[in-house]
Structure formats: C-alpha cells, structure tokens
Amino acid sequence: MAASQLAALEGEELGAGEPALTKASPAVLYSEGQRLALEALLSSGEETFWACVQQERLPPFLSADEAQALATAAEDWLVPSQEPGAAGTGTAITDGDVGSLTYWPRQSEEPAPLLRLGWPEDTAWKGITRAQLYTQPPGEGQPPIKELVHQEIQAARKLVAVVMDVFTDPDLLRDMVDAATRRWIPVYLLLDHQHLPAFLALAQQLGVNLWTTENLDIRTVQGHTFQSRRRRQVSGHVREKFVLLDGDRVISGSYSFTWSDSRLHRSLVTLLTGEIADAFNQEFRVLYAASRPLSAAPARSPLFSPPEGPQLPRSPHRVALRCPVAPVAPLLSDGPLAQRLAACHILERDKQETPTTTGPALSDILRSVQRTRTTSGPPTRPSRSLWDLSRLSQLSGSSDGENESKKFWVSKDTPARALMRQRGTGGGPRAEMDSRSQPWGGPLPSIPARRLRYLSPAQRRLGDNATTSDWASGSGSGRRR
C-alpha cells in the first residue's frame, strides 16, 4: 500500500508542515489584522483604516462604500445605568466595566422574554415540508408577491409574526392592523432599528397609534455589534425577511414591504409549509429575545396643535363661526396703573371691532320656514258643523287690524250664530251683527222671529184654507167653556 494511502487512512493530509484550514480553525472566522484595521476605522476614519490594511498586508476585505458606511454608523460605547432613578439612560463605560471579550453571561444565562401577546402551541405533526417559489415580476399563472402576502395575512386565524428590514407599504400595514383589531389575532412585528423612523412616519400618516393598538406588538432588532477597545461600536442590520402565519406557513425571501419592491425591484420568495415552520418558529423567538420595545410615546403639547396631515375645509356658513362660550376677558395684571389702563383700552377696542351683525339664528330660520308653509299651504275647507263654522269665522276676523282684535269675541255675530237664531235657539243680540264680508259671500239677512204652529195631518192635507185654529187657541177656548 502506498504511503499516501496509509496517510489518508490515518487521517493525515499532504503538506503536514502547514496547518489545515477547517471549519473549527480560528483562522477561518477570525483575523487579528482585520480586527486592528476595523478598530482604526471606527476610531480614526478611513485613511487610518487603509493605512492599517497596507501595514498588515491584508486583502481589501471592505469596499470603499462599506468602509464609509461603517465609519458613519460608528458611535460611542454606552451601557445602561444600573441606578434606580436612571433607568433607560446610558453612560460611558469605564475601564473597570469592561467585561470579557469572549463570554457574555447576560446574553447566555438570562431567560428569554415571554411573548407578550401569547403564542399558539401546536405539537401536532405539520406534515411533509413543501416549497413553492414566487417571483417579482410574477410568473405565468402566479400572483404578485404583494398579493400573496395580502392573501395569507387575510387567511391567518391564530398568528401573524413578521421580521422585516424596511416596512413602508401602507396596504400591508392596514392588513395587519385589521387582523389585530377586527379579527383579534396576535400580530408581532420585528423591524430593523435603523429603518424604524420611516415606519413611524408611515403610521402617523395613516393615523395608526402604534402604542395603543391592541394585539399589535412592535419591537426593533439589530444585527451583531462590534465593540472596540477604544469604546467605539458599530451594529449591523437585519437582513432576515420572513412572515410566519399560524405557526405552519412561512413566506421567506428577498422581498421587502416597500412600493419599490412591489413595482420596480426583482425579488423572489418561497412559501414553505410543513415541519420546516418549526425552524422559523424558533428563529423568531431568538430574534424576539434580542429585540427591544419601542420608546415611550411622544408626549403631547399642553397647547392644542393641529395635525400635520391634510386639514378639513372650513365651512362657508356663518353659523360655524359662532362660539357657544363667551370669550374670556384678558386678566388685568397687578403692575403699574398705566399697564392696567392699556389692557382695558385693548379690551374695549376689541369689543368695538367685534362685528355685531351675525347670521340668522336657528330659531329665526325655523320660524320663517313655518310662516312660508302656512301661507303657501292650501286654504282651510269650511265644515258644516257649528264648531268649525265658529272657528272659521274667528280666523277670518282675526286679521283686520289691532282695533278689531281688541273686541270681545262674544259680541261678534258669526254665521254660526245667525244659523242658530234662524233655528230659534238664540245666539246673541241681532243689533251687533257684523257687516263684514264673509269669504263665501255677503252677510246673512236677519230673519224675524215668529211663533211655531203645530199642523195636524188634516190641516197639512187641506193647506192654509183650513178653518181650524191651532192647538194652543183651541185648548184655551175649551178651558173657557
């Protein structure tokens, strides 16, 4: 057997004088020269960085744009203060606070935070892993990626968990708010910390309050952080993009929730179902443990300030300008007499400049409408009853002036009273009959009163030539006999 074969069986490789590069070798993932060059970049700038690269004889592991971006994003290394009254503040680290560069007990020993809105626990087998590819622009017979995400969010019933770098699509934000508030589904959203201002501006323009919306948990997450010995640090971005739905479906790919990705950029996503969803479930929990909640809601000014969005048009009606509360007079200061007199003078001038003519009040408008309806309506039709005739005569005589209205209503002669006198039931003095013209004709003539006579059947047959007297006279003559 050849020596090379024996070396292969024994695990030895050719070139035993040089160490082999394996995945476990530190030289693959770590370079002391790159660390020194990066510290020079964060502390002194790009020129010092390129000088260190040449001195250490390193290949150009950073492009010019990447080096410029890292130098711009560098910041001081701050640690949160542990004092009770200084929660959430940051202080510069000192030499005694420098911990181990290879071991972080706080990141490895602290328990992961609980999911605030809950998480569906489903231990059942989810089936075989299946994958379906979608592209943008869409392929033949496939929906656009934005439509796919919209349909899957609408179909969710237990959970919507999103990890995204850039989120500026208003339609997808409305879908998530609708799922959280109307269908009562827990919605988690982890965003890259450097692109959070764009998302907050979108929510403000849509009128969505991210701090008070129920079933909506929004947090920020960042990449790994490099901290130099000179108390400078730089953090990376979140490049993961996936949507976990109900714990059994995942949409993952290069698509971002922006208008440019839905219309201009080329991207692709994969719809995964089955057991692979458990891996994304675990990854989301890890990211949630490393995330941070949103800062406190911005405090409102004590004075009213109109929103920055489009204003509603003002009403052209003058009624809208009325104030139900009387304007408050300015308080007089306790200063010299000249200042108080000046304040009184300003108050009187404002009262004089205030226009006294205002628009018609609501009661005036209603009164004019009722008057118009009364005059333009059909005339009252007279009735045959005595009560209606009396009311009609009173209404007809109520518009002849103030002198006529002062007369007492009993002294007026009405058609109803004339009819009652004709029937022999009285009705007031005939001398006070009103000679005013009635709406239906002239005044009724006065009929003299006469005695009623009872006619027997024989007299009614013979007529007026009958010689028999009436029953009153006959009964009287009989009594005289």
UniProtKB/Swiss-Prot annotation:
GO molecular function, one term: protein kinase binding
Residue ranges, annotated region (Disordered): 351-481
Amino acid composition bias (Polar residues), ranges on this chain: 391-400, 465-474
Gene3D superfamilies: Endonuclease Chain A
Sequence segments annotated as region (DUF1669): 1-296
Amino acid composition bias (Low complexity), ranges on this chain: 371-385
Keyword Cytoplasm: yes
Primary residence: cytoplasm
Location relative to the cell: Cytoplasm; Cytoplasm, Perinuclear region
UniProt xrefs under InterPro entries: FAM83 (IPR050944), SACK1 (IPR012461)
Keywords: Cytoplasm
Family: Belongs to the FAM83 family.
Assembly description: Directly interacts (via DUF1669) with CSNK1A1, CSNK1A1L, CSNK1D and CSNK1E. May interact with RAF1.
Domain observations: All members of the FAM83 family of proteins share a conserved N-terminal DUF1669 (domain of unknown function 1669) domain of about 300 amino acids. This domain mediates the interaction with casein kinase 1 (CK1) isoforms. Therefore, it has been proposed to rename DUF1669 the polypeptide anchor of CK1 domain.
Function: May play a role in MAPK signaling.
Name this polypeptide is given: Protein FAM83E
